[in-house]
Regions:
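Catalytic nucleophile loop
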Residues: 109
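ATP/NTP phosphate-donor binding region
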Residues: 1-99
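Acidic-aromatic/histidine active-site loop/patch
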Residues: 106
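A glycine/threonine-rich phosphate-anchoring loop and its flanking beta-alpha core
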Residues: 8, 17, 23, 114-149
Length: 149
């Protein structure tokens, strides 16, 4: 069973889905069909979760799916920590119609949100928060940030 909450903001509306086993049962087709997708996965997220997501996305006929696994900590939540994400997007010629997916906790959702907001002046983003704090804070509300010190 899942619940959907529609969030309305001045810059645009979005949907928050809440439930268990959504990755394996959600119909992603309207979001991913014929699109390039980059999943940025926190290294602490079990590979089984990534595979469930990858299978579900593949059933929705994307153009391609790439995965980048990153180490997350307050040190990597920086400009330098973002470089590998930008490099994968650029090396694979991801365009403005691509989709970025953040799979992990609050640091991951902050980093991926920052990249989505700045790559090619903004690309589509799906956040899949995997910790309680990221589910109630970091992945919701449209805020994102990195450390600069």
């Amino acid at each position: 069973m899942s619940k959907s909450i529609n969030v309305r903001t001045p810059s645009g509306d979005y949907e928050v889905l809440i439930g268990s086993k959504l990755l394996g049962s959600y119909n992603f087709k309207w979001l991913v069909q014929n699109r390039q997708i980059l999943i940025v996965k926190d290294s602490m997220v079990p590979n089984e979760i990534l595979e469930t997501l990858r299978i579900s996305l593949s059933n929705s006929q994307p153009m391609e799916i790439k995965v980048l696994e990153i180490e997350t900590n307050e040190k990597t939540k920086s400009f330098e920590g973002l470089i590998p994400i930008f490099e994968v997007l650029n090396a694979n010629k991801f365009n403005r119609d691509c989709l970025l997916i953040g799979l992990g906790g609050g640091i991951t959702t902050d980093m991926v949100g920052f990249v989505a907001a700045s790559y090619l002046r903004g690309i589509d983003l799906i956040q899949i928060p995997t910790t309680l704090l990221s589910q109630v804070d970091a992945a919701i509300g449209g805020k994102t940030g990195i450390n600069f010190a």
